[in-house]
């Protein structure tokens, strides 16, 4: 199992698919990383068939040119925290755990709001 950017890649998958297991790398970036390897890595190569040199090459490309995993997560959470600290509308929506980008909340938005809680009326 090859370890790239601190992640164990699944050994039976092709390298272009396996790179998508790294947070911050999608289909497009995975193909770009392989292209930047200057033909040293074939996209159809399985992870188990990668040599140590090829794995190191992937590591160096990812470290130099991409923000992935912890670094990317820290940047995103820092951006959200900046909105919250400035007291902006987006920050308040994040603080209240409501949709940030203008979606309706009378119905839907269950992902952000969580499981339904009944707000019943009290009998007199």
Curated annotation (Swiss-Prot):
Q: Where is this region: Disordered?
A: 87-124
Which segments show compositional bias classed as Basic residues?
91-124
Any matching Pfam family:
Ribosomal_S13
Gene3D superfamilies tied to this protein:
1.10.8.50, 30s ribosomal protein s13, domain 2
Keyword Electron transport attributed: no
Any one GO molecular-function label of the UniProt entry: rRNA binding
Q: Which terms in the GO cellular component ontology are assigned? A: cytosol; small ribosomal subunit
Query: Would the keyword Ribosomal protein turn up in this protein's UniProt record?
Result: yes
Entry keywords, A to Z: Ribonucleoprotein, Ribosomal protein, RNA-binding, rRNA-binding, tRNA-binding
Tell me, which GO biological process terms does this entry list? Answer: translation
Q: Outline the subunit composition.
A: Part of the 30S ribosomal subunit. Forms a loose heterodimer with protein S19. Forms two bridges to the 50S subunit in the 70S ribosome.
Q: What role does it play?
A: Located at the top of the head of the 30S subunit, it contacts several helices of the 16S rRNA. In the 70S ribosome it contacts the 23S rRNA (bridge B1a) and protein L5 of the 50S subunit (bridge B1b), connecting the 2 subunits; these bridges are implicated in subunit movement. Contacts the tRNAs in the A and P-sites.
Matches recorded under PANTHER family: 30S RIBOSOMAL PROTEIN S13/40S RIBOSOMAL PROTEIN S18 (PTHR10871), SMALL RIBOSOMAL SUBUNIT PROTEIN US13M (PTHR10871:SF1)
User: Member of which family?
Assistant: Belongs to the universal ribosomal protein uS13 family.
Q: Know the name of this protein?
A: Small ribosomal subunit protein uS13
